[in-house]
């Protein structure tokens, strides 16, 4: 099983490398973030993130992002471990991906220094499930970089991706009354011109 996962990882990395060769913009992972909020006991909200993201925007407007789920960061090491093992099950599902198509006219407008607010249909692949979402974003550029920022959070329902059982396992092990399965997610993505 681990061999299959390793082979899949190598193939995915090879595909991403080939695709990035045709990229117009490459993700600046150091200055980008995908954040999500967990709400426990119906009153306590905490923000978490992922430390490892890769991605690109292609010349035709095709967008691909890959999230290393093992890089989840909650600022509490034992909680990081529990999310990796009990929620995301990263041995079996090491990454999530986001694919989208952006109208090239939007990229052209932004490349000239404009700012565009729009809604982008995306395909989220998470925990073996693919689902279509609409993400409201603001896109802008300072000439040397492209920024894509959530206009408002997108609500991800854990049950839609087969994660409700993992949320329940986390609730039990932490001794909580509840953890919401409706999870607000925000994007703050910055891309640099591909060489």
Q: Language-model features: where?
A:
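N-terminal signal peptide c-region/cleavage motif recognized by signal peptidases
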Residues: 16-18
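Bacterial N-terminal signal peptides that target proteins for export
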Residues: 1-8
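Low-complexity, acidic/polar, glycine-enriched regions of mature
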Residues: 21-195
């Amino acid at each position: 099983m681990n061999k299959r996962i390793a082979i899949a990882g190598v193939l995915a990395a090879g595909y991403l490398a080939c695709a990035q060769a045709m990229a117009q913009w490459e993700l600046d992972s150091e200055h980008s973030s995908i954040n999500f909020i967990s709400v426990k006991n119906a009153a306590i909200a905490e923000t978490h993130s992922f430390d490892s993201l890769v991605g690109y925007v292609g010349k035709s407007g095709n967008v691909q992002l890959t999230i290393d789920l093992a890089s989840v960061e909650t600022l509490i090491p034992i909680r990081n471990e529990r999310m990796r093992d009990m929620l995301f099950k990263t041995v079996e599902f090491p990454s999530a991906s986001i694919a989208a198509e952006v109208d090239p006219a939007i990229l052209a407008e932004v490349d000239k220094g404009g700012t565009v607010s729009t809604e982008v249909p995306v395909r989220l692949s998470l925990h073996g499930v693919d689902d279509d979402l609409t993400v409201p974003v603001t896109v802008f550029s300072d000439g040397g970089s492209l920024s894509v920022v959530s206009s408002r959070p997108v609500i991800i329902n854990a049950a839609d991706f087969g994660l409700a059982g993992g949320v329940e396992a986390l609730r039990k092990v932490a001794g909580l009354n509840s953890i919401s399965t409706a999870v607000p997610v925000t994007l703050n993505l910055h891309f640099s011109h591909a060489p």
